[in-house]
Structures are given as structure tokens and as C-alpha cells.
Amino acid sequence: MPAIGIDLGTTYSCVGVYQHGKVEIIANDQGNRTTPSYVAFTDSERLIGDPAKNQVAMNPRNTVFDAKRLIGRKYDDPKIAEDMKHWPFKVVSDCGKPKIGVEYKGESKRFAPEEISSMVLAKMKETAEAYLGESITDAVITVPAYFNDSQRQATKDAGHIAGLNVLRIINEPTAAALAYGLDKNLKGERNVLIFDLGGGTFDVSILTIDEGSLFEVRSTAGDTHLGGEDFDNRLVTHLAEEFKRKYKKDLRSNPRALRRLRTAAERAKRTLSSSTEATIEIDALFEGQDFYTKVSRARFEELCADLFRNTLQPVEKALTDAKMDKGQIHDIVLVGGSTRIPKVQSLLQEFFHGKNLNLSINPDEAVAYGAAVQAAILSGDQSGKIQDVLLVDVAPLSLGIETAGGVMTKLIERNCRIPCKQTKTFSTYSDNQPGVSIQVYEGERAMTKDNNALGTFDLSGIPPAPRGVPQIEVTFDLDANGILNVSAKEMSTGKAKNITIKNDKGRLSQAEIDRMVNEAEKYADEDEKQRQRITSRNALESYVFNVKQSVEQAPAGKLDEADKNSVLDKCNDTIRWLDSNTTAEKEEFDHKMEELTRHCSPIMTKMHQQGAGAGAAGGPGANCGQQAGGFGGYSGPTVEEVD
């Protein structure tokens, strides 16, 4: 039984299978090799694909599309609010998650985006089964490289709902690179930039392809909310305003008229890729009024100018992350229907100083082609040219946990190869602490408040011990689908707990991802200052507690009472100062450290305990996690990183 590759797109989906040594892209029952990602609900039936899109003007409120723009997001995501202005169907909040409300067979129904996507996936599965003449369960499904953990998990869930065993979730540009590398029989080592601009998402990935068989992703960047639909929206707004200006009627209140206008705008956009002018003719568009107009390519380019320019920022970022300059890129490969737009091509060509773009692979089918190859590899196909293929992908965002002072301590860095596993040792933050709370984040900023919380779990039952003594091993395991599993283990008792980060944790909005990554560069200096400030605070805190503990536990006769009281008074003063100056600057912490060292060092030297005291308590380090259960009534962080 063969495995299939599915490109689940925002506007169109495509399915392929690898057999007899080649990939076949499978046509649907209408004879089309791509299927609209549309689902319609009527009084009598549910329609998927071409039939759903064909009846959209008659039934706009109950025809659902763009599920990929909703999947794995929260209802209050500003991007969803923006999209809702353009959608004729109703999106409602269900416990903070978006649900789509439709009328089906006379009843009101609510569907999650995963359910709508699963219906499209089921259609692709049926298309493949009809062609192959047997039932299919195994599949590889593609997602934008910049999809976060929640969106990947939700896509995988959609596959399961559709009755598929999802062998792997792979990144769309990586799949396209696989198609390009195998199709072109590349020789030697080549750096390839995949520019993937589809109906709703945009990705840039740079790969090094060695002898057409080793595919190593060097970097990835993008915007999960930029694509052909956004260009359509600009054109629809322009045409609706022209209609209002000409006829003093606002058609935007009428979903059917707006849908007919959108269909005409999409057709005009496609025409403008090959002609310099497109004609729009719609009979009885609104209140019996016909609408005839022309749109020039120049006007369309002006309407979308900022969106087109925005495609170059991720290209620059991908080059920077891959540590390459423009001249080191051998091939620029265009993927996704929106790369047919001449202005997008010319901007990219100018950016690369006139270098020719590679237009030799089918931009609509390349991703499904690569997914089909990966499906064959994962199901054990050893035939021909795919037997030596090795694919090495990367994590799109850094992953870590919160340590004292709200610092993001990264365990897995952005653009790190996947699958990967990283372990770090942390400890408790206060004496006799019975448990720790591990808070998991993704993002690029230095402080967790600027990143996105993925999940949290508590590890309890830690035996009573001084702060810094228990050893808690935290392991991040990022699987080949880009889905994260986190575990924590207390080494002396062997107690362990783990969590798979799922999309029910109140996940990241795309606006936040964009902000995190883009602002990380802008605020690098500020982040570094904040990091240093927290490091200085932690060093002072660690030192003062270690000194205090050493003096309190000093054997009788090792230290005279006056010295002991002098050190304890100074330590208690410092602790009080720390409690009332939590937001002090780095210089203030450093000054206090000098003052305390000057006062305590001579006395500690007398004791011959300087090194031993610090060692016993685990030394200065970063501290981790907000306390979940309020252990011992202490409300601060509850784990400490061990050097």
C-alpha cells in the first residue's frame, strides 16, 4: 500500500504519489491537478473542492475556505479579526478558539478549523484512492516552514480526523527543494533559495543540496499570513470603492455581490500576470447594476506595492541566518502560484542583482511532489534515485524555559537541526523547596514575557535540601514533525514528569511571532542589557546566601562571634536591599557585590571556607521558572540552573 504526499494549501491543495520510480500528481474527479481548499454546506449535502467553490456566489455564508489561516490560532489573534472583514462566513469564539458557524441541513453547526481542513484532506485521500484503486492511510502533509508548534499539531490532528496516519509533517519549501533537487539531477554542492509565495502563506528557505541527495536546510524565514488572498483583498477593496464612486451604492453589505466581485478580482489578478490590462464584466452585480471596468497591471502593482516589498525582508533574514551573502546562492527557485506575478519576480531579481530566477518546476505542484517523495522514503521505498536521499530540516523558533528574573534560558536554538534533543541541569531556588514548576516558551527575546508560553508542568516530591543542591534534569525533545516533548527528572529520587506541547495551551498568534523575531534584532542591545542585569542580580543573590549559609553552619570555634554577627548583619542588609530593589540596574548590583565581598572576604578567608561554602550551594547560576504551587509560600522562581 503506497503512502501519499499532500500539499494542504490555503486556497488550493494537491496530492501526489511516488511509484514506478517517479512522482505522479493525481487529478481529481473534475480532471484538475489542484483542488480548491473549500467546503460548502447546503440544505441537503456537503460539498468539497471544485463543487464547493463553484457554488460559492449562491451560498457565500455556508461556504468555508481559508481554514489554514485559522488553524492553530486563538480567536483574539488580530490577523483573524482582519481576515473576518473579508470572509462571508461567520467565525465565533469557543473558549478562546475560533469556530466556524454554518447552516447545514437546516441546523446550525460549529466546526473547528481542524475539522474543515480534515474534510479537504479526506477529499485528497479519496482522489488518491480512486486513482490507485486501493485504500490509503499513510501520508506526509506539508505546512509552511514558519508554522508554530500549535499550527503543526493542529494540522496533524486534521490528518487524524481525516483517517490518515500522518507519517511526517514537513515544511513546504523543504518539500519543494526535494522536488527541485530530484527533478534536476543536481551535481556537486549547491546553495538553493526556495521562495514560496502561495495563496495565504509565505516562506523562504535556504538549503544546501549535495549531489542531489543530501538536502540540508540552512535557514528558514517567512510570514504565515501573506499570500495571494491578500493581493485579492486589495483589488476587491479598490473595485468596491470604484463601484461606490460610480453608482453611489455600497455593495460591501451584500455577501453575494462581494463574492462575485472577489471571483472576478481573482480572475483579473491571474490575467495581469500575462497581460498588462484585465477587463472586469459583472452583470447585475448589486441592486440590478452592471459593473464593467478595466484594471491595469501598474494599478494592481501600486495597490499591493507594500505587500510585494515585504517579501524581501524574510529573504534578507534567511541569508543572514544562513551566514551567506547573495553571491553564494546558486539557484533561486520559485514555488507557489503567487510567484507568477511579474512584479514579485522583478523585485526578487533586482535584489539578487539581476540573477536569473529558476522557473523550471511547476509552482503549484512542487510541494506535493516533494511530499510524495518523502512519503515513499518514510514508508521504506528503496527504489532508484530516492534511496540515497537524506533530508535535514531545522526548528523555526528557539525553545527554552523561564529562569529567575524571567530570563528565557534556551535549550534549542532557532535554525537548529531537527529532530534534536537537548538536556540541561537546573536546581531549586529556595531551601527545602518541595517542587518546581517548569515553564516552556518559544521565541527569540531575552525575557520570557516577550516570548510565547507553550505550556507548564510541576515536578513535586523533591526531598528537603538547601537551595542549589537538588539536581533537576530538563530535556527538550523536538521530533521530526517539529512538535516538542519536554521532560524533567529529579536525579536523587528518579521522579520524572513530561509534557507534549499541544495546541490547547493558548498558543501564539502570528502577529506575536512576527513581533518576536523582528523585534529581537531591534532590541538586541536592550535584551543584552537586561540579560546582564539579571546575571548580576543572580550572582549577588547566590553569593549572599552562600556566605550566610557558610557562616551559620561554621563549626564552633572556627569563627569568633563578632565576625559572625558582622557577616550575618551585612548579609541580611543585602537581602533586604535585594527584596526592595528588584528592578535595580546592573551597576547597582555590581556595586553591592563589591561592597559585600570587601566586607566578607577577609572573614571568610580566616575560616578557610571561601571555596567550599560557594561550592556546597551550587554556585551562582541562572534561576528558573515561576512557582506554580507556591511552595513554602515563596512566590518567585523555583528552579536554578546548575553550571
Swiss-Prot record:
Compositionally biased residues, Gly residues: 612-635
Keywords: ATP-binding, Nucleotide-binding, Stress response
Effect recorded for residue 306 to N: In strain: DSR 4
Span list, region Disordered: 611-643
Induction: Heat shock induces the synthesis of seven proteins at five otherwise inactive sites in the polytene chromosomes of fruit fly larvae. Two separate sites, producing two and three copies, respectively, code for the 70 kDa protein.
Pfam families given in the database record: HSP70 (PF00012)
GO MF entries: ATP binding; ATP-dependent protein folding chaperone
InterPro entries attached to this UniProt entry: ATPase_NBD (IPR043129), Heat_shock_70_CS (IPR018181), HSP70_C_sf (IPR029048), HSP70_peptide-bd_sf (IPR029047), Hsp_70_fam (IPR013126)
Tree of life domain: Eukaryota
Note: Most strains have three copies of the gene coding for this protein at chromosome locus 87C1; two tandemly repeated Hsp70 genes (Hsp70Bb and Hsp70Bc) and one in reverse orientation (Hsp70Ba). Some strains, including that sequenced in the Drosophila genome project have three tandemly repeated Hsp70 genes (Hsp70Bb, Hsp70Bbb and Hsp70Bc).
Family: Belongs to the heat shock protein 70 family.
Record-linked PANTHER family: HEAT SHOCK PROTEIN 70KDA
Name of this protein: Major heat shock 70 kDa protein Ba
